[in-house]
Each structure stands twice: as C-alpha cells, then as structure tokens.
Design a protein with these regions (language model features):
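PLP-dependent aminotransferase class I/II
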Residues: 1-114
C-alpha cells in the first residue's frame, strides 16, 4: 500500500530479534523530497530525521584521514539520500505511534511535491 505513495521499504524484524527502539528507518523513493516531508511532519509536531547522512566514508574524519570522496561508494550515498527515521522510543504509546503513521501516510498521499 505504501509503495504507491513513495515508501519503498519498511524494515521488518524477525520474531527472534528485539528492536533497539533507537531508530525506525523508512526507505523512500527518489520522487519524495525528504526536506519537504520533514517540514510537513514538523507542522504536525512530528520530528523526523536522517542521522546516517552523510555516509561514514564522507564524514570529515574519514575524508581527512583516507581521502575518501563523493562517488566512491555510490550505493551507500544513494541509500543515505533516500531514508528517513520516524520517531520511536521505549515508552511510545500506541496512540502516539498510530498518530505518527497516520500523519505520515496522509502527507505522502497529499497532492503536490513531497
């Protein structure tokens, strides 16, 4: 259902794995403008981010130490440009989680450039 709206994948964890509740990553299609998505989510008082961008090889310490450059790991770079993290924590209520998902879906279904 979400693929039509530009969500390419939502991570599903095996039943024998326990989620860390630190980040909930959603992979978006290239047609989604994640900066605009973040602005619209903030209007709903929902903070999203993308902490893994830039990827490790483009972090200043690695660029300085090893001379890594943009384009050296194209798949990693593309993946980092297309993910967002939805809010998640140990004490999130079901009501809060449903609100986050509901607003996320609404924004993606809206007409316009998201």
């Amino acid at each position: 259902e979400m693929e039509k709206e530009g969500v390419l994948s939502i991570i599903k964890y095996p039943s024998n794995i326990r989620h860390s509740y630190w980040r909930y990553i959603v992979k978006l299609s290239e047609k989604i403008d994640r900066n605009l998505l973040r602005q619209k989510m903030l209007k709903k008082e929902i903070a999203i981010d993308w902490p893994y961008d830039p990827p490790l090889h483009l972090q200043p310490v690695f660029k300085n130490l090893y001379g890594t450059k943009e384009g050296m790991m194209k798949r990693s770079e593309q993946a980092m440009k297309r993910h967002v993290c939805l809010p998640i924590h140990l004490k999130i209520t079901e009501e809060n989680a449903m609100y986050i998902v509901s607003e996320f879906k609404k924004i993606l279904k809206e007409k316009g450039d998201v």
